[in-house]
């Protein structure tokens, strides 16, 4: 959700029970404004909150003028002081995939994981136990990256792609119509396209290259991983991810108000294919 309209956005997303105390809201409003100024970001998004056993991580993201350029991620434990996180790498994601359970809420906390490694001694091969330590900060970076790639979404038309390459905020976007807002095909993944590149020319024939340049939600696997509901007498559409419980997207049809927020434990629902 955009930090410039934080209070309205929190109110629209509150139907899922994702609220903040008045003092946290006030701290966020002020500190995110300073983050935008100090880091010179084009936009700052309040990404959400990852719940820990000792403390919670409040996450924000800074966007450059090109909206699909890699986003800078920051975290805070008190909504006042923000620390920049390193970009996610494949090695980080692989390392963190072995860690299960809740976050602690301490970035310096280290998880211990035991791995078996083969050791050659002459002609004999032995398996040796090695203890690998993984920092919670590494896991935090990895989980945020996975959630971004899997379930960060925007409505069709909110961004447009120029013929020269960069992607900008569409200032003429006035919201989806009520009928369009009820369709999963009206929402895109907020990242570089993956599936779009595999489509045939015939499938791309009806697409507008300036608007339909990202992957649509309608072909997400597993099918049925999104819940879509109309609330407040059709004045608000809410999408919830069943794959990453805690991710809520909201949009008020025929208005510019949209956004997503994640409030959860940072754990993926691996059982979803068996639950559908």
From Swiss-Prot:
Q: What is this protein called?
A: Radial spoke head protein 9 homolog
The record's section on PANTHER family has: MITOCHONDRIAL RIBOSOMAL PROTEIN S18, RADIAL SPOKE HEAD PROTEIN 9 HOMOLOG
Q: Which GO terms describe its biological process?
A: axonemal central apparatus assembly; axoneme assembly; cilium movement; cilium movement involved in cell motility; motile cilium assembly; radial spoke assembly
Give the species. Homo sapiens
Q: Where in or outside the cell is it found?
A: Cytoplasm, Cytoskeleton, Cilium axoneme; Cytoplasm, Cytoskeleton, Flagellum axoneme; Cell projection, Kinocilium
| Keyword match Cytoplasm | yes
Q: Which domain of life is it from?
A: Eukaryota
Pathological condition linked to this protein in its record: Ciliary dyskinesia, primary, 12: A disorder characterized by abnormalities of motile cilia. Respiratory infections leading to chronic inflammation and bronchiectasis are recurrent, due to defects in the respiratory cilia; reduced fertility is often observed in male patients due to abnormalities of sperm tails. Half of the patients exhibit situs inversus, due to dysfunction of monocilia at the embryonic node and randomization of left-right body asymmetry. Primary ciliary dyskinesia associated with situs inversus is referred to as Kartagener syndrome.
């Amino acid at each position: 959700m955009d930090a410039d309209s934080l209070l309205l956005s929190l109110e629209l997303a509150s139907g899922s029970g994702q609220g903040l105390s008045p003092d946290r809201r006030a701290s966020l409003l002020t500190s995110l404004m300073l983050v935008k100024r100090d880091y010179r970001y084009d936009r700052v998004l309040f990404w959400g909150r990852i719940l820990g056993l000792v403390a919670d991580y409040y996450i924000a993201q800074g966007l450059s003028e090109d909206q699909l350029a890699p986003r800078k991620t920051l975290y805070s434990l008190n909504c006042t002081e923000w620390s920049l996180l390193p970009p996610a790498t494949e090695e980080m994601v692989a390392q963190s995939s072995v860690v299960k359970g809740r976050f602690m809420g301490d970035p310096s906390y280290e998880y211990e994981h035991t791995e078996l490694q083969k050791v050659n001694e002459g002609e004999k091969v032995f398996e040796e136990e090695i203890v690998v330590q993984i920092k919670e900060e590494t896991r935090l970076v990895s989980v945020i990256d996975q959630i971004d790639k899997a379930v960060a979404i925007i409505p069709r038309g909110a961004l447009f792609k120029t013929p020269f390459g960069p992607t900008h905020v569409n200032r003429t976007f006035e919201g989806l119509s009520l009928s369009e807002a009820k369709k999963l095909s009206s929402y895109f993944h907020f990242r570089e396209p993956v599936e779009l590149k595999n489509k045939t020319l015939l499938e791309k024939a009806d697409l507008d290259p300036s608007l339909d340049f990202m992957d649509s939600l309608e072909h997400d696997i597993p099918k049925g991983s999104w819940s879509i509901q109309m609330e407040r007498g059709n004045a608000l559409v809410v999408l919830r991810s069943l794959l990453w419980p805690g991710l809520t997207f909201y949009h008020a049809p025929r208005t510019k108000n949209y956004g997503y927020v994640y409030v959860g434990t940072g754990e993926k629902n691996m059982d979803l294919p068996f639950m559908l």
